[in-house]
Amino acid sequence: MGHKIHPTGIRLGITQEHRSKWYAPSKTYPLLLQEDDRIRTFIKKKYLAAGISDVLIARKADQLEVELKTARPGVIVGRQGSGIEELRSGIQKTIGDRNRQVRINVVEVEKVDADAYLLAEYIAQQLEKRVAFRRTIRMAVQRAQRAGVLGLKIQVGGRLNGAEIARSEWTREGRVPLHTLRAEIDYATKVASTTYGVLGIKVWVFKGEVLPKEEQPLPVGSSPRRSRGNRRPQQFEDRSNEGK
């Protein structure tokens, strides 16, 4: 069953959290759900070069909180935070409410090569440049292994290398326990547009197991203490709306 169901959906409330956190009555629920989709689509299209891994949305009364997980936060923040104001006005225009309070937090992805979506995006970019798919997969696996992931599975499907008949090929390195609910599986999909058609990309990344009474997974053999040599991931929190 673990191979049939969506890896994220089956782990909601165990190791995964919802990407949208808010409550609404049945009449306004569809409108807010479409609003979240428009916001994510707008951000992904506007910041293609920022390496955005995920967009989390939360609502509190009339305030909208948007958290961006990105590999290059400087592209979004800009000089002296000018990019934040531009992004806020763009979100307000997208949802059609200029008076809505929008709070934006930009969080840097600590390990880019251990993120499933960023790995899938890297594979898609290489395939669109006509790089051989086996070479691309091998390079992605090497990058993930250097990042310290415990397991990785990559699947690519379509007209591989321009073949007449579409097929799917996959590779796996390490452990990817899809049946274990306490396993933190980072899953992402991406579509690569090539001259021969579109290729579907799926990436599973196993980062560790969440044991009872633990909030974050600890990889095998690692220590919970952070070494002094490791750099803290950058986080930019928007406080411009406070006090209004």
UniProtKB/Swiss-Prot annotation:
InterPro entries named among the record's database cross-references: KH_dom, KH_dom-like_a/b, KH_dom_type_2, KH_sf_prok-type, Ribosomal_S3_C_sf, Ribosomal_uS3_bac-typ, Ribosomal_uS3_C, Ribosomal_uS3_CS
UniProt record, GO biological process: translation
SMART domains, A to Z: KH (SM00322)
Feature: compositional bias, Basic and acidic residues: 234-244
Region (Disordered): 214-244
GO cellular component: cytosolic small ribosomal subunit
PROSITE patterns for the chain: KH_TYPE_2, RIBOSOMAL_S3
A GO molecular-function descriptor: structural constituent of ribosome
SUPFAM superfamilies from the UniProt entry: Prokaryotic type KH domain (KH-domain type II) (SSF54814), Ribosomal protein S3 C-terminal domain (SSF54821)
KH type-2 domain ranges (all copies): 39-110
Alphabetic keyword roster: Ribonucleoprotein, Ribosomal protein, RNA-binding, rRNA-binding
Family: Belongs to the universal ribosomal protein uS3 family.
Subunit structure: Part of the 30S ribosomal subunit. Forms a tight complex with proteins S10 and S14.
PANTHER family, sorted: 30S/40S RIBOSOMAL PROTEIN S3, SMALL RIBOSOMAL SUBUNIT PROTEIN US3C
Function: Binds the lower part of the 30S subunit head. Binds mRNA in the 70S ribosome, positioning it for translation.
Protein name as it appears in the record: Small ribosomal subunit protein uS3
Gene coding for it: rpsC
